[in-house]
Amino acid sequence: MAEIYRLRNKFKHYEWGSQTLIPEFLGVENKKSVPYAEMWMGNNKGAPSQVCLKGDRDSGVLEDLIKISGELPFLFKLLAVEKPLSIQAHPNMEQARTGFKKEEESMLSMSAPTRNYKDDNHKPEIFCALSPVTLMAGFKESEKILESFNELLNVLPLLYEILEPALGMLKTGTLSQFFRMLFNISRLEQEYLCSFIREIDEEEIERTSHIISAAQWELIKKFARLYPSDPAILSPFYLNCVNLMPQQAVYIPAGVLHAYLSGFGLEVMANSDNVLRGGLTPKHVDIGELMNVLQFVPFIPEIITPPDGASSFCYNTPCREFLLFYVSGTQTFKKEGPAICIVIEGELKTGSLIFKKGDSFFIAKGGAAVSFEGNYALYAACPGE
């Protein structure tokens, strides 16, 4: 049987994270009451995992094992979203190589807040829900975008002069021209727009709103409260809103604008930390570079749903860097390593090792397929085919 090693992982305490979801899932106390946004599982240089080599006390660097057992071309994350993440997109391979080379040649520090490219890799990703999750992903059809904005103007006609230049581009130009014009709104106009949206009358919404759902209005008002001078508060009008139930997943290719808004889940991506942000964040926003990587075409994300009662399931994607598996019961994990697994329910035994909810482990390459015993459920990430 392949060698298996318990993992010790590092956390990202971004302000959008939850103080409770990850600590409770792992069974640890959050003594400092800090937000736990992400737990990284893998060998990305931004937060590389360690492995327990003998029992639980001695540890080594996962990268050293990977050199022996084969490449680990993906990064596996646990995400806990209390506040909305930025609207963002990730580059394709060519864009990542070009952007990384440019920033390296400019001698821009890797830790600089204006750094966009931390590496030269693309970053397609899949997000799988562990709780109900809300996100936005992909541009709507131009006609649908116009319908949404026209309904906004029915509720708030005073915004017509601010929004008409961008909407005019959508009618006679392209989606990219609309997007650029929307983000060229002056700061004063942005603040004016946000103030009106914050104070919008609920009865007026009920009377005039038929296309925009109550949940979308709540999102927009929430964005206006959190980011009172940000044109990205209007993103629910031009991006698809998606709701996931536990075990459901969406695949987000490079170049697709998206934002995770709330919930708890797992994310697998190509081993990269390249992010281009467009708003809804105090972090660095680079609209010009974001537009360079965006695919300005409508994109409706497909929700991947396992069959009811499935004890194992593969979340297929076109990405060769990773596959995501769900395994439960007494199933044999038939993929060869390397792989990273995280237990989400119950307890399992494999060989002399016991893993409980919240535990993660690395399966090295080589040896026979791994069998798990017990009453458990886990997710496993491994290289694609």
Question: What kind of feature is each model-predicted range?
Answer:
Residues 79-84, 88-94, 119-123, 129-135, ...:
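Ligand-binding loop in jelly-roll beta-barrel domains
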Residues 181-246:
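A charged, amphipathic alpha-helical module
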Residues 308-311, 320-336, 354, 365:
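Conserved short histidine dyad/triad with adjacent acidic residue
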Residues 34-36, 71-72, 82, 121-123, ...:
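A short beta-loop-beta micro-motif enriched in histidine and acidic residues
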